[in-house]
């Protein structure tokens, strides 16, 4: 079992890739069960992470996201799987010319592909809240993704890449 701060990177974001490529190959956007067409590729990448890790494979379950970031910052690791929000921390050590975000190779012609995005986390509104609080929450979420100040805060202050055409362009290289 992975430490909870790393769990999402390898079992969620990384696992999105074989599912994405299978959906693309089959021309679908939903299914009751995947066929597993690209699961060998997922296993190969996961195995590579274990065999070429900065520590013994038996120690990986205790490693945290902070450990992973620090190993990258200290030059112990060449690659660091994470998201655009890590730019703030990494830019304290590295210049933009020293950083890049690259797709994870999954054995398909993906030279024009973008980067993996986690869709497992959604914004939620508590239906048990007061109508006033529900409306305030909805207004705030709308402000975050439609207003200049909101999208600027999300892209610059929080480091998120916002997939809306009206959003501010992120200032980080990721």
Show where each model-derived region lies:
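Extracytoplasmic/periplasmic solute-binding protein
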Residues: 1-31, 77
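Pocket-flanking alpha-helical
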Residues: 12, 87-93
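Glycine-centered hinge/linker elements that transmit conformational signals in sensory
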Residues: 30-61
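Extracytoplasmic/periplasmic substrate-recognition and gating elements
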Residues: 54, 92-158
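Short helix-initiation/N-cap motifs at beta->coil->alpha
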Residues: 59-74
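Beta->alpha turn/N-cap motifs
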Residues: 65, 82-87, 119-121
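Alpha-to-beta junction loops
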Residues: 74-82, 97
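Long, aromatic- and glycine/proline-rich binding clefts that accommodate carbohydrate-like moieties
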Residues: 154-174
């Amino acid at each position: 079992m992975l430490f909870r701060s790393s769990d999402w990177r390898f079992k969620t974001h990384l696992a999105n890739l074989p599912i994405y490529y299978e959906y693309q190959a089959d021309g679908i956007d939903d299914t009751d069960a995947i066929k597993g067409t690209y699961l060998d590729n997922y296993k190969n990448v996961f195995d590579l992470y274990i065999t070429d890790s900065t520590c013994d494979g038996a120690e990986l379950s205790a490693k945290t996201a902070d450990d992973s970031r620090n190993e990258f910052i200290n030059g112990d690791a060449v690659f660091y799987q994470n998201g655009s929000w890590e730019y703030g921390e990494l830019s304290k050590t590295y210049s933009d010319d020293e950083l890049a975000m690259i797709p994870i190779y999954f054995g398909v012609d993906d030279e024009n592909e973008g980067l993996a995005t986690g869709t497992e986390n959604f914004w939620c509104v508590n239906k048990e809240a007061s109508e006033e609080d529900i409306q305030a929450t909805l207004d705030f979420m709308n402000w975050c993704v439609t207003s200049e100040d909101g999208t600027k805060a999300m892209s610059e202050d929080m480091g998120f890449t916002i997939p809306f055409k009206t959003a501010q362009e992120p200032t980080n290289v990721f």
